[in-house]
A protein has these predicted regions:
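Charge-rich, low-complexity N-terminal segments
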Residues: 1-38
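Conserved short hydrophobic interaction patches
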Residues: 12-13, 68-72, 76, 112-126
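Hydrophobic residues embedded in beta-strands of well-ordered beta-sheets
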Residues: 26-27, 46, 91-93
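Short, well-structured hydrophobic secondary-structure segments
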Residues: 37-58
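Short, internal acidic amphipathic alpha-helical interface segments
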Residues: 53-92, 96
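Well-ordered alpha/beta subsegment
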Residues: 90-114, 118, 125-136
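Short, highly charged C-terminal tails/helix-capping segments
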Residues: 128-161
Length: 161
């Protein structure tokens, strides 16, 4: 399915606003709550994604964080089959959702976008608590120096914003 056709489907949306896809197949939309919603057209689907957290140096210092996220991800249930993806290069954890482009209609596309928007933020909030818990639990067990604990407290404060 080509970008022009996908953009024409977007114009038929009644309840959700998404920006048009650019020539590279990517759309970026700032939602009412301030979050950025990204969408990407692939050969088989339109993938929606939102950033959960950039782990930065903490990714190397706490390799258990992503496995903790996977163990707590609750895939397939409460959050309507959203999934998490970790980009090791940028150390960003993403929440993703795919809509098959086979027989894609404006209604089906809009319903998928609504489902993602409705479920992504509660899922992101949940995952951020897992990240924070992972950092704090590891510190209490391993006796990490207080300066690192303070740094993780800053991360907790940042995640609470």
């Amino acid at each position: 399915m080509d970008i022009i056709h996908i953009n024409n489907l977007l114009k038929q949306f009644k309840r959700v606003h998404l920006n048009d896809f650019l020539e590279n197949g990517i759309s970026t939309t700032r939602l009412n709550d301030g979050n950025e919603l990204y969408a990407n057209i692939t050969d088989k689907s339109v993938m929606f994604f939102m950033s959960v957290e950039k782990l930065g140096d903490n990714a190397e210092d706490h390799p258990n964080v992503f496995s903790d996220l996977l163990a707590a991800a609750m895939a397939g249930g409460k959050f309507s089959n959203l999934r998490i993806v970790y980009d090791k290069e940028t150390t960003i954890v993403w929440v993703c959702y795919d809509i098959s482009i086979d027989h894609l209609t404006a209604d089906r596309f809009e319903e998928g976008a609504e489902c993602f928007i409705e479920n992504a933020q509660p899922y992101i909030d949940y995952l951020r608590t897992v990240i924070t818990s992972s950092f704090l639990d590891e510190n209490s067990v391993t006796g990490v120096p207080q300066s690192n604990v303070n740094g993780m407290s800053n991360i907790h404060n940042f995640l609470s914003i």
